[in-house]
Amino acid sequence: MNFKRLITTSFTNQIKNMKFKKTISFKPFDINNRIIYDKEPTIVFKDQKSCLLKDTISTTLEDGSKELKIKIGRFTPGLDSNNNYISSDIFEININNYSNKIDLCLNGKNPTFLRRKGKIPTKVKNWEQLLGEQLEIRKSVTLEDGDIISFLGLNGTTSSIQFTIEEDNENEKEKEKEMELDNDNTNTESIPPITSKSTSTSTSLIDTNKIQLKKHFEDPNSKNVGLSALVYFCNKPESFLDVVLYYDDKTVAVLDKYPKAKHHYLVIPRVEINTLDELTPSFIPMLEHMYNVADAIINEIISKDNDDDNLKKSDFKLGFHAIPSMKRLHLHIISNDYNTKYLKNNKHWNSFTTEFYIPFDKILNELKSNGKVKVSIKKKIKKNKKKLIH
């Protein structure tokens, strides 16, 4: 079953104030052979503000604490939707905002078992010894890292998942905050206005000798990257030189993992910011620096790419997605040929050829004029079931 990211505004609003500092995920597990499948994990809760399961509700307890109830069943990404022995609402995970406690409560009548922390006996005589303790309906148990939940089917067949619970790395977040630009000391007057018809002469501030043009990934699936990959690149770009084109103390430029054109790159700020809504006037110098890096990369491509003798600046588009597909806001540099095997469907096409793709100068000018960026297309996306997010 394909893993899909299922976030809606209502879920995000419910959990955006959660102080819970752990990430919960699970993978299918072969309990008979003690093998965890090499698949993308299903994220139950992540980053204190993202819940990837839609049947999520938030309640306030008598002591004033908030509790998040996340329902899980056979239609949850990562579980077998054809397995009738897993009900559509088999159990729920309850997260307490203040105690950081994670409880699991069985809702369905299907026989469900808990094996603590993956500790499976070497020799077992029956499936009861293998699967562990049978859970009781409506009785909560504490969920811990490594726990295996198993569902009993016909003739002793089983289906199992193993949970991973990870602490958020606060040290990395602190390091990112320390790298924020000293905007009070930045002379923005030296940077001329940037429009789609003019380019900034301050690209000379970019050391073009540091730009290393690269071909795109031969096999993107071989790269161990996920929703937080851009954060990893920013934290330690020198460790990803096969992906990184350029980096300095403010930005990192990388190859796009699934390029939607012959030339497709990302410029990422090293300061922590994830959406256009978070932009304030203090980020203007950062955006202008991102533009200068992008412009320098385009100049390098035009001057050094022998396959494109007629390539011009007008052949490139700089812009942001209205809703970023990954953690950390990033600026796209993309050529307008859209000649790539990764442009597979309408969503991919729409994400760069409709108003979902917002030009750089529109974002910068709106921020300068209004002091904030209002992404109006979000309302259209909410009403449209066929979302443009890719």
From Swiss-Prot:
GO terms for biological process: single strand break repair. CDD domains: aprataxin_related. GO terms for cellular component: nucleus. Gene3D superfamilies: HIT-like. Residues 232-343 form the HIT domain. Transmembrane segments: none annotated. Residues 184-201 have a biased composition (Low complexity). GO terms for molecular function: DNA 5'-adenosine monophosphate hydrolase activity; double-stranded RNA binding; mismatched DNA binding; single-strand break-containing DNA binding; single-stranded DNA binding. This is HIT domain-containing protein DDB_G0272839. It comes from Dictyostelium discoideum (Social amoeba).
